[in-house]
Every structure is written in C-alpha cells, then in structure tokens.
Design a protein with these regions (language model features):
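TRNA-recognition modules of translation machinery and tRNA-sensing kinases, especially anticodon-binding
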Residues: 1-177
Length: 178
C-alpha cells in the first residue's frame, strides 16, 4: 500500500518550503520590530471554544471542524482559525487586561472541499491587540489600531503584494471573573 498526504493537505518540500520560510521570516521580523509578542497555542482545543467564539450556527462549526471525542467523552477540535485559541491563552494566563499586542502563525484545518486557493490545511498569520477599552482613552485606542494597520501594511509592502483586501475586526469581550 502506498501512502499519500490527505486530500487538501500538502507537504512543503524543497523550494516551496524555502519560499514559505522566507515569507515567514519576513513577517516575523516585521511584527517583532513593531513590538508584538508571539503566542503559540495547541493545535487542538475544546470544541466549545470555537462554538462560542465563531458561532455555533456557522458553517465552520457545523460542517468544517475536524472534531473527535477524547477518552473522557469531551469534544475536541483541531483549530480552524487562530483568534479563539490566542484569546483563550491570553485570558488563561492573565494577560488580557494589561493591554498586549500579539501575533501568531501556524497551520489551521477546515474540512471543506479543496479547490484552487483553498485547502483543508492552510497557514494563517494574525495579529491581535487586546486593550481594556473601559480604562483606555480614545487616543490610546486609535494609537493601537494604527499600530496594527501600519504593521499589516508594512507586511504587504515587504512581501510585494499588489492586490489585497485588508479586513479589520474589533471585538469587544465582556466577561466577569469568577
């Protein structure tokens, strides 16, 4: 029997691996120069995290998650995106209320029909800037937003990307401590 990589999940070898490494090193150098800290999260999280953050009625949660039950009958999912795990890590490590700028880079997984430009395993880079909006001035919030935008535009320039769409989301998290 001959083994192959799973459908929609490709190996990176040779020149392709070198190209990915070059792009990643340029991105990492830039985000570090802006003062962002790296966050590495597990590939798997409890499914409830994605249901709550992405939405339990979304296609990502209902159709595209790679999920399984562990030996304790807990539903576990392989990450389909990075934000949920990063925010969970910052909250769990008590870094969410201090104002922090972080970046992440890594493989994400979605069970969808592979097609041009869309695979089941893909690399995602993201920056997250957490700040206490109640304790921060409007000026601080604008400065934080401009820092994120400036960093992302510099990445686009360094990578010589001509045709791009920049999407920015502002999520206000409300929660109480136990």
């Amino acid at each position: 029997m001959k083994y192959k990589s799973l459908r929609g999940m490709n190996d990176l070898v040779g020149d392709q691996a070198k190209k990915y490494s070059l792009v990643e090193s340029k991105i990492i150098s830039l985000v570090n120069s802006y003062g962002f800290d790296e966050v590495r999260t597990p590939l798997a999280e409890v499914t409830e995290l994605f249901e709550r953050s992405i939405g339990s009625s979304t296609d990502i949660v209902n159709k595209e998650l790679y999920s399984f039950e562990d030996r304790n009958n807990k539903s576990i999912s392989i990450r389909p995106e990075g934000t949920a795990g990063v925010v969970r890590a910052l909250i769990e490590n008590d870094l969410d209320r201090h104002g922090i700028d972080v970046w992440y880079l890594g493989p994400m997984y979605r069970y969808e029909r592979p097609q041009k430009g869309r695979l089941r395993q893909f690399q995602q880079f993201g920056v997250e800037s957490l700040i206490d909006q109640e304790k921060s001035s409007q000026e601080e919030l604008i400065r934080m937003e401009l820092k994120v935008i400036g960093c992302l535009l510099d990445i686009v320039e360094v990578l010589n990307i001509k045709d791009f769409k920049l999407e920015i989301n502002n999520i206000c998290l409300l929660y109480t401590s136990d």
